[in-house]
Amino acid sequence: MNRFFSLAIFILSSFVLLNVAFAQDETHGAFDVVYNQDTFTDENRSFILTMPTDFRSGWSEDNLGFSMKCLADGLNVLVIWGKFFGGDRDDRVAVTYRLDDRPSPGPMRWTMLPSSEAAWMPMHLVNDFVAEARTARTLALRVTDPLDGETITNTFSLEGFGTALDRIIPCR
């Protein structure tokens, strides 16, 4: 869990998660599971997180993180990076993904979080993505900042994805 500690803290702070009742960690394949429950509402705010397959040690601004997190609107798909991206006029970045050797659906606009160092997938795409990811072995992610064209690309192992995800859903 040490290799994910700083990224997990970043995700938690990005969502301004106050009043966390408990946090307990476990690992399934390439994924860490972090359990969080709001003290007052009992809402599930748990998440799973993985780092790129070529991740060595220490977080760098040239790495992406891949996460799925329970929020008030349900299960969210997130990509995290370690530097400021300007985004477009709607605070979005271009995200392209590819599962195994399947064709990529092409670049999509994902809305950035207020930190400008993470973005989430549009909710109407999440269920199809999850269904496809459950049967895949790898995920390639590319994030491009439309402001200046800066790009970060990483590949992730999806080993343990289904098991880890099943540990945090349903998101209630």
Task: Please place each PLM-identified region on the residue numbering.
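Bacterial N-terminal signal peptides that target proteins for export
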Residues: M1-A8
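Generic extreme N-terminus detector
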Residues: F5, A21-F22
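Bacterial N-terminal signal peptides
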Residues: A8-L17
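A generic "folded-domain core" signal
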Residues: F22-R172
